[in-house]
């Protein structure tokens, strides 16, 4: 199993995503002899998981069942163990597009955190690209290395343990894109410029506060970045349902005789009353050649 390439059968050591029902999932490490307790009963790894195809519908000990899904960066994002606040797929999708990531791209990232963005970047740049990710916290860096190894993507990522604001990314003039998710991104803008290729590249910074954005944009302009833009992703979910509205009473002028009768049912979409609010601002910029 790899987060980059699909494999048919579940093997020992794989990470599998158990779908327990609508909106309920859990990630498990498949180990021979291990068991996983679910609300549907016990799932025995040796019997119920190993050797079965991903996507199988598996019956648990109490008669309930789960679907065993192949891991993807999107599924990992909603099931990973949180070591820090993370970005979700809505923001990540825009980041990977605006950074123009593709197979073969070299990317510098800080901080690694829980690895949510890292997995999406690796999937975008494999099989010939590479990610240099910087995490100043030793335990988080060690855990990220362990997860990259378990998920069989370690060949596409190097984890650097250092303060990016003081020491940079550990590489110079190799990156096609730089992504920052740190408290003071303006302090790392100079290192981002140095890490990007001489012929240019793309920059992105995630910040929850507009004051951070202002200082980052000032630093970007001072270092020569161009095409500065800041975006906020606010998805609007619609609830689609079948409704039936009675025809209006038009009085004596209603020649059809349909006063008060029901109209033909139709499908209607209305915005959900509760939607996802502000997560953060995404600031993009370009390093131009020369």
Curated annotation (Swiss-Prot):
Any one cellular component term from GO for this entry?
nucleus
* PROSITE patterns linked to this entry: SAM_TRM61
Entry EC number(s): 2.1.1.220, 2.1.1.-
Catalyzed reaction equations: adenosine(58) in tRNA + S-adenosyl-L-methionine = N(1)-methyladenosine(58) in tRNA + S-adenosyl-L-homocysteine + H(+); an adenosine in mRNA + S-adenosyl-L-methionine = an N(1)-methyladenosine in mRNA + S-adenosyl-L-homocysteine + H(+)
- Tell me which residues bear N-acetylserine: 2
| GO terms for MF | mRNA (adenine-N1-)-methyltransferase activity; tRNA (adenine(58)-N1)-methyltransferase activity
- What EC class does the entry list? transferase
Q: Which GO BP terms, alphabetically?
A: mRNA processing; tRNA methylation
Protein family membership = Belongs to the class I-like SAM-binding methyltransferase superfamily. TRM61 family.
Main location class:
nucleus
- What is the species listed in this Swiss-Prot or TrEMBL entry? Rattus norvegicus
Which compartment or compartments is the protein found in?
Answer: Nucleus
- Enumerate the Pfam families for this protein: GCD14
What the entry lists under Gene3D superfamilies is as follows: 3.10.330.20, Vaccinia Virus protein VP39
Q: What is this protein called?
A: tRNA (adenine(58)-N(1))-methyltransferase catalytic subunit TRMT61A
**Which residues does substrate bind?**
279
Task: Write out the ranges of the annotated region (Substrate).
Answer: 20-22, 35-42, 64-65, 85-89, 110-117, 180-183, 205-212
- The UniProt record gives the binding positions of S-adenosyl-L-methionine as 87, 114-116, 135, 140, 163-164, 181
In which domain of life is the source organism classified? Eukaryota
Which keywords does this chain's UniProt record carry?
Answer: Acetylation, Methyltransferase, Nucleus, S-adenosyl-L-methionine, Transferase, tRNA processing
């Amino acid at each position: 199993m790899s987060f980059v390439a699909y494999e048919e059968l579940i093997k020992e050591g794989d990470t599998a995503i158990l779908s327990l029902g609508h909106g309920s999932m859990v990630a498990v490490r498949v180990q021979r002899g291990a068991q996983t307790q679910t609300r549907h009963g016990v799932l025995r790894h040796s019997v119920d998981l190993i050797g079965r195809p991903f996507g199988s519908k598996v019956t648990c000990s109490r008669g309930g069942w789960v679907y065993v899904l192949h891991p993807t960066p999107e599924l990992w994002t909603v099931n990973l163990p949180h070591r820090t606040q993370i970005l979700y797929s809505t923001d990540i999708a825009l980041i990977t597009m605006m950074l123009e990531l593709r197979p073969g791209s070299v990317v510098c990232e800080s901080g690694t955190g829980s690895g949510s963005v890292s997995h999406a970047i690796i999937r975008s740049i494999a099989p010939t690209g590479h990610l240099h990710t910087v995490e100043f916290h030793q335990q988080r860096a060690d855990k990220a290395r362990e997860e990259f190894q378990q998920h069989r993507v370690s060949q596409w990522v190097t984890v650097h343990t250092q303060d990016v604001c003081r020491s940079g990314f550990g590489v110079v003039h190799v990156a096609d894109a730089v992504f920052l998710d740190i408290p003071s991104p303006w302090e790392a803008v100079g290192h981002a410029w140095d890490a990007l290729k001489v012929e240019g590249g793309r920059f992105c910074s995630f910040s929850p506060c507009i004051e951070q954005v202002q200082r980052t944009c000032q630093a970007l302009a001072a270092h020569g970045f161009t095409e500065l833009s800041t975006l906020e992703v606010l998805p609007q979910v619609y609830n689609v349902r079948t409704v039936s509205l009675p025809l209006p009473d038009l009085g004596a002028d209603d020649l059809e005789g349909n006063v008060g009768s029901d109209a033909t049912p139709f499908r209607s979409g209305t915005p959900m009353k509760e939607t996802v609010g502000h997560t953060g601002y995404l600031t993009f910029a370009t390093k131009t050649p020369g």
